[in-house]
Amino acid sequence: MAGGGGDLSTRRLNECISPVANEMNHLPAHSHDLQRMFTEDQGVDDRLLYDIVFKHFKRNKVEISNAIKKTFPFLEGLRDRDLITNKMFEDSQDSCRNLVPVQRVVYNVLSELEKTFNLPVLEALFSDVNMQEYPDLIHIYKGFENVIHDKLPLQESEEEEREERSGLQLSLEQGTGENSFRSLTWPPSGSPSHAGTTPPENGLSEHPCETEQINAKRKDTTSDKDDSLGSQQTNEQCAQKAEPTESCEQIAVQVNNGDAGREMPCPLPCDEESPEAELHNHGIQINSCSVRLVDIKKEKPFSNSKVECQAQARTHHNQASDIIVISSEDSEGSTDVDEPLEVFISAPRSEPVINNDNPLESNDEKEGQEATCSRPQIVPEPMDFRKLSTFRESFKKRVIGQDHDFSESSEEEAPAEASSGALRSKHGEKAPMTSRSTSTWRIPSRKRRFSSSDFSDLSNGEELQETCSSSLRRGSGSQPQEPENKKCSCVMCFPKGVPRSQEARTESSQASDMMDTMDVENNSTLEKHSGKRRKKRRHRSKVNGLQRGRKKDRPRKHLTLNNKVQKKRWQQRGRKANTRPLKRRRKRGPRIPKDENINFKQSELPVTCGEVKGTLYKERFKQGTSKKCIQSEDKKWFTPREFEIEGDRGASKNWKLSIRCGGYTLKVLMENKFLPEPPSTRKKRILESHNNTLVDPCEEHKKKNPDASVKFSEFLKKCSETWKTIFAKEKGKFEDMAKADKAHYEREMKTYIPPKGEKKKKFKDPNAPKRPPLAFFLFCSEYRPKIKGEHPGLSIDDVVKKLAGMWNNTAAADKQFYEKKAAKLKEKYKKDIAAYRAKGKPNSAKKRVVKAEKSKKKKEEEEDEEDEQEEENEEDDDK
């Protein structure tokens, strides 16, 4: 329903809400009284149905709003259909942006729609798009349908229905004239009248309750003659309109006094006789939508040329969504009186259950039944369902795959499958009577269940079918033998009185069945020859060809000479080898989410390794992998390798893949130039030569003389002596190492940032005037010698504390003496500093500064000269 049934759903609701209007369109033109009465009653029915739907809508507003999880396309569809204004649409959108729940917004919209409730509101609510986007609306829609069907008012009570049924039965028994016919009405079923089918195109109402109401109104308002005349004219007009269409909904029932059989002509055009004439003679309107009660019992076989047309109509309009429950409780005696039989149509996609409680029926008391949803289905000819269905199933198991084209079309053409029973019959005999309704039952993946009372009859039929099919397997062509005192559903045991149409179909199908028999025999001979070859090759005992090709729990397939596939020579026999990997693949772990909002060009990047988090500093990372460039959350510094170990990923030994930034590994960031390639610093390795001359002399000297102090001048002399004894090739190795170290030094110096050192103290002129002391310091200079004399062991801090205590305890008058003295010294300092600044720096001070600078330069020059001399001496020694 949600996939494409939006148009169907709204159409069905529309038909349920206005059924009387649909029926009004097909009344005869001359029946003005009936038309006037229908017009008056139409308003009452419409208002009643409107109230039912409106109350159900009002009660289920909360459920509808809860089923709609998002505003699109619900609000947009209502706005496009002009059911809500643009202002209301914008207000609803603003409410959703302000975090108001969508269900609350939808409920407010439904409350506004309640004020102007009409059919377009339901059409917009249950549209195709809404049913796809909001699947929870499906059961709400079904609730609307159920309420309409359940609460639809019935104009007649149950007693009147029983009287009408009894009147119908009496009219059929007596076979009176046209006055005895009445319009047959059908009470509503539990399921929708045309669920899963296309609504009628001719405008006829499919709901049974409205048809029943119309018939009741006709009965009450007109006399018996007028009633029969009006109903006959109405049915004639409806039958003429519905006849050309493919989805007819009305079937005429013809009752003959001389024969108890009933016939429902096919609405499709036939070759011999048109059903339109019979509709003019005896027209009884029957809605085949919802069938409650029908009984087809104890019928006699009759001949009709339109049987083939009926079977074709059922074949092409096969419905796969109905449950057919046939219940017939028969008496042991056989009568020619027709009794009602119940046919229930319930929810789609179920299994048909056939219950036959009386196994003692005679061949003249065969049952037939058929019910469909919207397509016209014809009452079947007399037959035995129990034996025919078992015969068809057993024959299907043994003759599966006779022809590829036939097997594909067999699901739709059930009469062709039934006619294949001529394979077991003589060529001169007639074919059995087959059920025309089995085409509607033969649906893929459908099961049949039979009651326990039929088990004995079914088992007897299956044994005879096994006997018939065994002759085909032997390829002898003999006729099947029939046990005594047992009924069989095959061709030889079926009663006479077959219609001429059946004879024609049976004769036309005998040619194809004989070809199938020849194919089966040829197939058996071919498999016997293959068995001989297999015996010669494998030295095994001879086995029957058909049994060899058969496997356990698999149906036997008979291939014809035309469609048999030749086996390729290069194709290997036996089972195919498993070429797939036998090892179970390791399941991939959950992917690490990637953060696209990180700016990788920052100098500091957040990194993670396992559950440990930290911050990577690019400036430190540039200096090398041995530098501690990652700071954890607890302010600890780590190298990349140490941070990898800290995150419990030390076993991988690949920090470029273990450490991630925003979900990306450091390797990816370095490849994309977001991180610089850090210089790899390796441990210094001491090269060893064959003569042990490339050993570090400093380390060797320490090992030999661990307690002796090493003088650098003496050590250089020893190194120069060993350098002279080394060959040129060995010196080249050291020269290469020196060049590599120099290049490494130059590369590091480009990115080296010297640490910020302390600022140099400004040069102070010793001849400059000094600042005067404060009053407290003058007090301390006077009393400090006294305290030290009294307490010689006191520290400086203790002395200062005591002096501070004494200063605080001194009276203000005593403090004035020190304060006045400090003020005089301050005035003198001001005069001296002013005179010093006016004169400028003295020459002596300038000379001292110049001398200090010269001495520094001289020291640097002397050190450079010494280095150059040492290099020259080393070069001379090499020469």
Swiss-Prot record:
Locus of motif D-box: 165-168
Compartments, as annotated in UniProt: Nucleus; Nucleus, PML body; Nucleus, Nuclear body; Cytoplasm
UniProt region (Disordered), positions on chain: 154-245, 345-386, 401-596, 835-879
Residue stretches of biased makeup (Acidic residues): 861-879
HSR domain sequence ranges: 33-149
Chief localisation class: nucleus
Tissue specificity as recorded in UniProt: Widely expressed. Sp100-B is expressed only in spleen, tonsil, thymus, mature B-cell line and some T-cell line, but not in brain, liver, muscle or non-lymphoid cell lines.
Maturation and modification: Sumoylated. Sumoylation depends on a functional nuclear localization signal but is not necessary for nuclear import or nuclear body targeting.
DNA-binding region, residues: 677-753, 769-837
Motif range (Nuclear localization signal): 536-553, 568-592, 717-734
Entry annotated with the keyword Signal: no
Bias type Basic and acidic residues, positions: 207-228
Cysteine-cysteine disulfides: none
All residue ranges annotated as the SAND domain in the record: 595-676
Assembly and binders: Homodimer; isoforms are able to heterodimerize. Interacts with members of the HP1 family of nonhistone chromosomal protein, such as CBX5 and CBX3 via the PxVxL motif. Interacts with ETS1; the interaction is direct and modulates ETS1 transcriptional activity. Interacts with the MRN complex which is composed of two heterodimers RAD50/MRE11 associated with a single NBN; recruits the complex to PML-related bodies. Interacts with HIPK2; positively regulates TP53-dependent transcription. Interacts with CASP8AP2; may negatively regulate CASP8AP2 export from the nucleus to the cytoplasm.
Function: Together with PML, this tumor suppressor is a major constituent of the PML bodies, a subnuclear organelle involved in a large number of physiological processes including cell growth, differentiation and apoptosis. Functions as a transcriptional coactivator of ETS1 and ETS2 according to PubMed:11909962. Under certain conditions, it may also act as a corepressor of ETS1 preventing its binding to DNA according to PubMed:15247905. Through the regulation of ETS1 it may play a role in angiogenesis, controlling endothelial cell motility and invasion.
PANTHER family found in the cross-reference section: NUCLEAR AUTOANTIGEN SP-100 (PTHR46386:SF12), NUCLEAR BODY PROTEIN SP140 (PTHR46386)
Miscellaneous: The major isoform Sp100-A, has a calculated molecular weight of 54 kDa, but exhibits aberrant electrophoretic mobilities, with an apparent molecular weight of 100 kDa.
Name of this protein: Nuclear autoantigen Sp-100
Gene giving rise to this polypeptide: SP100
